[in-house]
């Protein structure tokens, strides 16, 4: 398990764009499971949407990318580097994510060739699938 301070040693994101609070498990270069506690105090809820706060889908995808980046950047050859989005396929949003929800984010790397790779991510609230996507990334 990794706490927020350990996560910040691996990925460069910071408030308000650090979208993972804890890593529950990680297999370096293979997969990671993380948590995001969705608080009513998140800055994006001021405008998305007033009176009906919903976590933007793009931020759920970004949370997946950050969890996946932890797994990739723990590999010795990528220590101290950054992972960048290179593409996204088959993104689907199945359930709204609202204040008070806890997102469990599961990301599994499917392919890594040199510094470019592909991963599959899913985000759950409880046992309910909230979002899923295939993510492409490049490490620099």
From Swiss-Prot:
GO biological process: fatty acid biosynthetic process; lipid A biosynthetic process
Reactions it catalyzes: a (3R)-hydroxyacyl-[ACP] = a (2E)-enoyl-[ACP] + H2O
Gene Ontology MF term list: (3R)-hydroxyacyl-[acyl-carrier-protein] dehydratase activity
EC code: 4.2.1.59
Enzyme class label: lyase
Keyword terms, alphabetized: Cytoplasm, Lipid A biosynthesis, Lipid biosynthesis, Lipid metabolism, Lyase
Pfam families xref list: FabA
Primary localization class, coarse: cytoplasm
Keyword Lipid metabolism: yes
Top-rank taxon, per record: Bacteria
Record-annotated active site: 48
One annotated Gene Ontology cellular component of this protein: cytoplasm
Annotated InterPro entries: FabA_FabZ (IPR013114), FabZ (IPR010084), HotDog_dom_sf (IPR029069)
Protein localization: Cytoplasm
HAMAP family linked to this entry: FabZ (MF_00406)
UniProt record similarity statement: Belongs to the thioester dehydratase family. FabZ subfamily.
Protein's name according to its UniProt entry: 3-hydroxyacyl-[acyl-carrier-protein] dehydratase FabZ
Organism annotation: Pelotomaculum thermopropionicum (strain DSM 13744 / JCM 10971 / SI)
């Amino acid at each position: 398990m990794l706490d927020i301070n350990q996560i910040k040693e691996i990925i460069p994101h910071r408030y308000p764009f650090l979208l993972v609070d804890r890593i529950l498990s990680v297999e370096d270069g293979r997969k990671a499971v993380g948590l995001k506690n969705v608080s009513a105090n998140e800055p994006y809820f001021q405008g998305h949407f007033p009176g009906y706060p919903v976590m933007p889908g793009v931020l759920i995808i970004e949370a997946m990318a950050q969890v996946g980046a932890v797994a990739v950047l723990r590999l010795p050859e990528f220590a101290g580097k950054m992972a960048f989005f290179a593409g996204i396929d088959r993104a689907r949003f199945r359930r709204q994510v609202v204040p008070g929800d806890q997102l469990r984010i599961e990301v599994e790397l499917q392919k890594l060739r040199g510094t470019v790779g592909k991963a599959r991510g899913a985000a759950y609230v409880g046992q309910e699938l909230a979002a899923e996507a295939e993510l492409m990334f490049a490490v620099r």
